[in-house]
């Protein structure tokens, strides 16, 4: 294991920061076309009469479930054809699938294309970015990952508005295809120029560079089970709230205040990433994770207790401050609590479990909202999940709490 002075896993630091830039653009691409744009696809495909809203919601859940299983296929592809080729294939699948969606009329074709897009998402999103950046950085891995994954937040500001504007100007099919093609071309150029394995790190046997060790020996590891549980439960609540934020808050404070709360969540997510990025490598990863989930619970508590717009907006900002950081922190668990050769396998396992759970988050929140008729029950359940995740973060398998 490298010491704190070994900032990089390679003697060429500038190459490491080029990887961070490339990973940032991967995050913009993946979250832009494979996460935030899902709501755009659902809205405009339903509006055009191509598919029903219920069918599109089911296809979205299918997308995330297939994506969870696809993570293992992507790991196998990386071992066989290399990381760059696997990412290029993912770019083609995700961008090509998005461009094809407006041409579809058959439900079978819709689910088939969403399934192919899920493989593209798996090859370009969180697990891939974490493994790529982790192969180049050691002591400052938290900083590098936070900067790279800031692209996920940036995608929410840039890709969706650009896609909506393109659809309004050029029509549904041309608008989506244009945005997808531009994103794919830009990312493809960066991948061709920058993405490669750090050979010096492979020779040294550092964390993240070696091929992923088989996940089999980890299956009964209590640390991995607890880690997957805490992030899976926390992400489930997080995605449930974010997907239903407007339906939950509009009846409580009105459309204008609810929209302001969504904007506060997004802005706080970006700010929270930048603040934590500069200090996360010096902090205890378990305490940071527990504090992040607890902060989200406090934000939900404010939304529950407050009657006017201010508590809802402030609560949404507190919730949002941890949104981005909670997809970075699993990498620090993997680096600090597991052997270097297991880094990639641990990341894949945690993301696959988490994605299976959070795939059902929007549906669960919607059902609770419909059944109860108010935002109180969904918010209480999400708050309880975040507190449970915080408690799990403070517990080390073997009975030792922090």
Task: Mark where each language-model region is.
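Extracytoplasmic
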Residues: 18-53, 160, 239-246
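Hydrophobic core of transmembrane alpha-helices in multi-pass small-molecule transporters
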Residues: 28, 109-124, 232, 311-324
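Extracytoplasmic gate region of multi-pass secondary transporters
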Residues: 38-42, 222-278
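Helix-to-loop junctions at the C-terminal end of transmembrane segments
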Residues: 70-82, 273-284, 369
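C-terminal ends and interior cores of transmembrane alpha-helices
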Residues: 92-105, 295-307
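Intracellular juxtamembrane helix-capping segments at the cytosolic ends
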Residues: 123-137, 325-338
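Helix-loop-helix hairpin linking two adjacent transmembrane segments in secondary transporters
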Residues: 152-198
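C-terminal transmembrane helical hairpin of 12-TM major facilitator-type secondary transporters
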Residues: 265-269, 275, 280-333
């Amino acid at each position: 294991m490298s010491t704190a002075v070994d900032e990089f896993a390679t003697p060429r630091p500038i190459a490491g920061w080029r990887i961070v830039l490339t990973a940032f653009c991967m995050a913009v691409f993946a979250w832009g076309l494979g996460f935030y744009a899902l709501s755009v696809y659902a809205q405009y495909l339903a509006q055009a009469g191509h598919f029903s809203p219920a069918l599109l919601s089911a296809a979205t859940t299918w997308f995330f479930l297939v994506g969870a299983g696809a993570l293992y296929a992507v790991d196998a592809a990386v071992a066989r054809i290399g990381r760059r080729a696997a990412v290029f294939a993912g770019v083609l699948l995700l961008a090509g699938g998005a461009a094809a969606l407006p041409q579809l009329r058959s439900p079978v074709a819709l689910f088939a294309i969403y399934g192919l897009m899920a493989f593209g998402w798996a090859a370009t999103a969180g697990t891939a970015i974490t493994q790529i950046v982790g192969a180049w950085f050691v002591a400052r891995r938290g900083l590098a990952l936070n900067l790279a994954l800031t692209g996920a937040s940036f995608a929410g500001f840039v890709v969706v508005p650009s896609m909506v504007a393109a659809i309004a100007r050029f029509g549904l099919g041309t608008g989506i295809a244009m945005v997808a093609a531009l994103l794919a071309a830009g990312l493809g150029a960066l991948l061709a120029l920058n993405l490669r394995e750090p050979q010096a790190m492979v020779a040294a046997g550092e964390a993240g560079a070696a091929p992923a060790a088989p996940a089999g020996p980890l299956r009964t590891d209590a640390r991995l089970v607890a880690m997957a549980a805490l992030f899976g439960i926390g992400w489930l609540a997080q995605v449930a709230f974010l997907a239903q934020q407007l339906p939950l808050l509009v009846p409580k404070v009105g459309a204008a205040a609810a929209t302001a709360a969504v904007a506060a969540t997004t802005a706080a997510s970006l700010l929270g990433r930048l603040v934590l990025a500069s200090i996360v490598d010096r902090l205890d990863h378990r305490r940071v994770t527990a504090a992040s989930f607890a902060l989200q619970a406090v934000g939900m508590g404010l939304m529950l207790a407050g009657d006017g717009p201010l508590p809802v907006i402030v609560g949404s900002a507190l919730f949002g401050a941890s949104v981005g950081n909670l997809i970075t922190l699993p990498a620090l668990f993997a680096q600090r609590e597991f052997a270097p050769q297991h880094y990639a396998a641990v990341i894949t396992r945690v993301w696959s479990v988490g994605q299976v759970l959070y795939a059902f988050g929007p549906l669960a929140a919607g059902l609770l909202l419909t059944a109860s008729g108010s935002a109180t029950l969904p918010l209480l359940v999400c708050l309880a999940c975040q507190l449970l995740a915080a408690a799990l973060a403070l517990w080390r398998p073997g009975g030792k709490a922090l």
